[in-house]
């Protein structure tokens, strides 16, 4: 446990390093900490913090910079988030961006607003598309071509174009959709397929043909996997900590290209409530030491369905980014639940 003097100096060092990006020396600490300490005393405290693994001294400078362990102590115990006025401004921007519409478009808008507000990369893990349907509708496009409209319980609307062996009249399409909605709504299409096998003798041939075509179109083309949406990757090219080294830059864009590590990290963070901070060099889930990820889960009707966050440098203004992530998650949950 650090004494108050050491806490103040560590907090000042990290705040100055985040603001300026340069190793912080004793003169800067004396100026900004508000403590009446001699340079020698400050150097002694810095030496103690270095022994504790909270700061390090780069070879090229007499100043010090925080370690991942130092950042962790800072965000867990010393961080002061932005003022209520700043949070109100964030809330207004997010509310304006997350307009009612199709869930997939709302989620994509969340990734965009995270990027725009943080000036880093915004990321959203979308919910798995439901195997279950709430309602379907058939619409005749032309001879032997029908548009199948599927509405999921989450409000997602999916369209499939079906090619059939014969033509169907509008009244036949309405009759078929009414029958399916009355008897099968709330089931997965695999369950519908099994039920059709059992009930095939009770249905007319044209009805059976149409239902089988709908089930086949839905299960063949359904995308049930989780998707990572990323917005603002290019913002990170402006961050020297991440882009100044070519090998590091290549690794960064491998993360965005492969997305495997991001999926794992976002999946882990979906199992805990509230904002979580993953710091590179400290968490094995963050593949680059100079990178941090701030995440929060979002919900639909009280059930966690995905995760969103901001990807940026370890040297980010956490006091600004944390409210952005928290507010966006809460407003995304509200918008999706009102659909």
Swiss-Prot record:
Q: What are the protein's UniProt keywords?
A: Repressor, Stress response, Transcription, Transcription regulation
- Family matches, as Gene3D superfamilies: 3.30.450.40, Heat-inducible transcription repressor hrca homolog, domain 3, Winged helix-like DNA-binding domain superfamily/Winged helix DNA-binding domain
SUPFAM superfamilies the UniProt entry points to: GAF domain-like, Winged helix' DNA-binding domain
Alphabetical list of InterPro entries matching this protein? GAF-like_dom_sf, HrcA, HrcA_C, WH-like_DNA-bd_sf, WH_DNA-bd_sf, WHTH_HrcA_DNA-bd, WHTH_transcript_rep_HrcA_IDD
Which molecular function terms from Gene Ontology are attached?
DNA binding
Checking Pfam families in the record gives: HrcA, HrcA_DNA-bdg
Task: For this entry, list what GO says about its biological process.
Answer: negative regulation of DNA-templated transcription
Question: Organism's domain of life?
Answer: Bacteria
Q: Which HAMAP family match?
A: HrcA (MF_00081)
* Protein family according to the UniProt entry: Belongs to the HrcA family.
Q: What does this protein do?
A: Negative regulator of class I heat shock genes (grpE-dnaK-dnaJ and groELS operons). Prevents heat-shock induction of these operons.
Q: What is this protein called?
A: Heat-inducible transcription repressor HrcA
Gene name, please? Answer: hrcA
């Amino acid at each position: 446990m650090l004494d108050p003097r050491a806490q103040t100096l560590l907090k000042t060092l990290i705040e100055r390093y985040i603001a300026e990006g340069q190793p912080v020396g004793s003169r800067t600490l004396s100026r900004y900490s508000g403590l009446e300490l001699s340079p020698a005393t400050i150097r002694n405290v810095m030496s103690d913090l270095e022994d504790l693994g909270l700061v390090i001294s780069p070879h090229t400078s007499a100043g010090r910079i925080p370690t991942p362990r130092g950042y962790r102590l800072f965000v867990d115990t010393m961080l002061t988030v932005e003022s209520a006025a700043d949070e109100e401004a964030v809330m207004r921007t997010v509310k304006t961006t997350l307009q009612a519409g199709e869930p997939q478009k709302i989620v994509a808008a969340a990734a965009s607003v995270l990027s725009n507000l943080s000036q880093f990369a915004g990321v959203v893990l979308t919910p798995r598309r439901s195997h279950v349907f709430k309602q379907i509708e058939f619409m005749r496009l032309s001879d032997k071509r029908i548009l199948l409209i599927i509405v999921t319980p989450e409000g997602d609307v999916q369209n499939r174009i079906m090619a059939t062996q014969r033509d169907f009249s509008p009244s036949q399409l309405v009759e078929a959709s009414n029958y399916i909605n009355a008897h099968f709504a709330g089931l997965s299409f695999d369950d519908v397929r099994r039920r059709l096998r059992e009930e095939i003798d009770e249905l007319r041939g044209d009805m059976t043909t149409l239902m089988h075509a709908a089930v086949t179109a839905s299960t063949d083309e359904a995308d049930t996997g989780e998707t990572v949406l990323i917005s603002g990757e290019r913002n990170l090219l402006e961050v020297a900590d991440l882009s100044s080294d070519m090998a590091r830059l290549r690794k960064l864009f491998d993360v965005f290209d492969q997305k495997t590590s991001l999926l794992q990290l976002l999946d882990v963070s979906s199992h805990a409530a509230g904002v979580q901070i993953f710091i590179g060099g400290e968490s094995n889930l963050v593949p680059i030491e100079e990178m941090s990820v701030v995440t929060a889960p979002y919900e639909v009707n009280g059930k966690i369905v995905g995760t969103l966050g901001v990807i940026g440098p370890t040297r980010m203004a956490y006091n600004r980014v944390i409210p952005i992530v928290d507010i966006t998650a809460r407003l995304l949950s509200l918008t999706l639940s009102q659909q």
